[in-house]
Structure formats: structure tokens, C-alpha cells
């Protein structure tokens, strides 16, 4: 399990240990308050060479929860920056049940509202819009699973929800291919592709939370 996802490359790997020691010997920390430094620039260039064309900016965060907070703030700021004030109403988030995105306030609002670890905060965090738990991929599931809803049926329901709420939805946030802390539940890549196409059709941004799936953890560099 690699500490769920924090140690995907193993424990005490000599290359990682050596890199950490080398960095500490050079300098341990420089804040990004209007500054940068050579290791950050090198890491940025390395990351941009890995990601799909069109992704050309990196924002460094110190945890998964903070990365979700920042991604949501970017989505909200995007709509708020438009001169068309009707777009300023796009403040809600769309996600599906069974997910987990972190423990700070905004991520808690898009974790499973009934069966997750944050049910205590119902009525306090901002209410969001939830699709049903995605139907399992019966071929890759880690436990016996029955696909009681087809991808086509699920996407038909998702389109209905988007049609009814697109004017107020800023972004859709999901864990692609596998819901991590929500139970290691796999769903079909076709479901992700279909949901992205619907979001594009209804003018909704898409946020992929790949804290648990990115950088080779699911077999490819990124799951999305």
C-alpha cells in the first residue's frame, strides 16, 4: 500500500535518500514569497515535460488537501474574473459519492457526505452537488462487485444533473479510475472520459484529484 500513497517508490530507497541528503547539505528551505530557486525551477521543468500539452503552469502545495483547496480557488477565481456577471454564480462543485479529497474545509465538502469520515460537518461545510457512487469496474475491482448501472446509464443521469445545475457549477472534481481512501474502488476509464465530455459541453471545469493515482501509482504516469 506504500503508506496508502505517500511512499509509492518504496521505503529508504538509496536514490531518494541520497537526493534528500544532498538537498539538505545545499539548503533546507526557501519560501516562495515572490522568490524561487534552482531546485524548484528544475522540478517545474521536469513536471511540465511529463504532463499533456496545454498544461504549462505548476503551483506547489504542501499536502493533498491544500492542493484541492488551491484547485478549487483557481476554478472559482476563473469564473469570477469574467466580465459576464452571470458566470459569477458558478460557485458550486460537482462530484460523486464515495470520494475522498482531504480534511480541510473545502475538500471535506466534496468527500462522501453520508458514509465518509466527515459526516459530523454536515450543515457547516458548503453543500455541494453529488452524483451517485460510480459503478464498479468488475474486471479490475479488488473485491467482488456487481455493475448494477451501466456507464451509459450513469452518464445519462450525470447529464441531467449538469443540465439542471450548470449555471451554478464551477467545477467537477473526481478521483479518476480509483477512489482511494473511499475504499479502493475502481471504475471504468470510459466513465471518466464521458464525464469530462459532459463537463466540456456544459461549460464546467474539471479537477482531477490524483494524489492517490498520479505518478505511476495506477500503472500509467497519470490515471486521467
Where are these regions (language model features)?
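Conserved N-terminal phosphate-binding loop of PLP-dependent enzymes in the Aspartate aminotransferase
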Residues: 1-224
Amino acid at each position: 500500500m506504500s503508506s496508502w500513497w505517500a511512499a509509492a517508490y518504496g521505503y529508504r530507497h538509496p536514490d531518494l535518500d541520497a537526493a534528500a541528503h544532498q538537498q539538505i547539505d545545499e539548503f533546507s528551505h526557501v519560501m516562495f514569497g515572490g522568490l524561487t530557486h534552482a531546485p524548484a525551477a528544475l522540478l517545474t521543468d521536469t513536471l511540465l515535460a511529463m504532463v499533456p500539452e496545454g498544461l504549462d503552469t505548476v503551483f506547489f502545495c504542501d499536502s493533498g488537501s491544500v492542493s484541492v483547496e488551491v484547485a478549487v480557488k483557481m476554478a472559482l477565481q476563473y469564473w469570477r474574473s469574467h466580465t459576464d456577471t452571470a458566470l459569477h454564480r458558478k460557485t458550486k462543485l460537482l462530484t460523486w459519492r464515495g470520494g475522498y479529497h482531504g480534511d480541510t474545509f473545502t475538500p471535506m465538502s466534496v468527500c462522501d457526505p453520508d458514509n465518509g469520515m466527515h459526516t459530523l460537518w454536515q450543515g457547516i461545510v458548503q453543500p455541494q452537488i453529488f452524483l451517485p457512487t460510480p459503478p464498479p469496474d468488475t474486471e479490475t475491482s479488488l473485491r467482488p462487485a456487481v455493475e448494477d448501472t451501466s456507464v451509459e446509464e450513469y452518464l445519462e443521469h450525470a447529464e441531467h444533473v449538469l443540465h439542471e445545475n450548470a449555471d451554478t457549477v464551477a467545477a467537477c472534481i473526481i478521483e479518476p479510475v480509483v477512489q482511494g481512501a473511499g475504499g479502493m474502488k475502481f471504475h471504468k476509464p470510459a466513465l471518466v472520459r464521458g464525464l469530462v465530455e459532459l463537463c466540456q459541453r456544459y461549460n464546467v471545469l474539471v479537477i482531477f484529484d490524483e494524489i492517490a493515482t498520479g505518478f505511476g501509482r495506477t500503472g500509467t504516469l497519470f490515471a486521467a
